[in-house]
Design a protein with these regions (language model features):
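PIN/NYN-family metal-dependent endoribonuclease catalytic core
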Residues: 12
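Enriched for short, Lys/Arg-rich terminal
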Residues: 1-9, 17, 21, 28, ...
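A short, surface-exposed loop/turn module that caps and links secondary-structure elements
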Residues: 34-58
Length: 89
């Protein structure tokens, strides 16, 4: 059994709204990346967000998935999805 198998994934409504505006091909890739988070939230092109406790961003192509890892509750909360621009961070 995987060490990360018991993580619960929660996705904010803002993320679902953002996904509707993204082209289908990119949307499918992003959804796959989000669904893989509970398998191992620390895998992939990750960077911890400065000034934020337990907040991370994962790079998926030209998009960024922002999420918080609540280690005690074993919850991953995806709270933002943005296309990478000079104003993303």
């Amino acid at each position: 059994m995987s060490l990360y198998a018991n993580w619960e994934l929660k996705i904010d409504d803002v993320v679902f709204k953002a996904l509707k505006k993204i082209p289908t091909k990119n949307r499918e890739i992003l959804l796959s990346a989000i669904k893989l988070l509970p398998t191992n939230p620390y895998y992939g092109d990750l960077q911890k967000m400065q000034g934020e406790e337990n907040s991370w961003r994962r790079r998926v192509g030209s998009y960024r998935i922002f999420f918080k890892i609540q280690t005690e509750e074993k919850i991953i909360l995806v709270f933002k999805l943005k296309r990478r621009t000079s104003h993303t961070y």
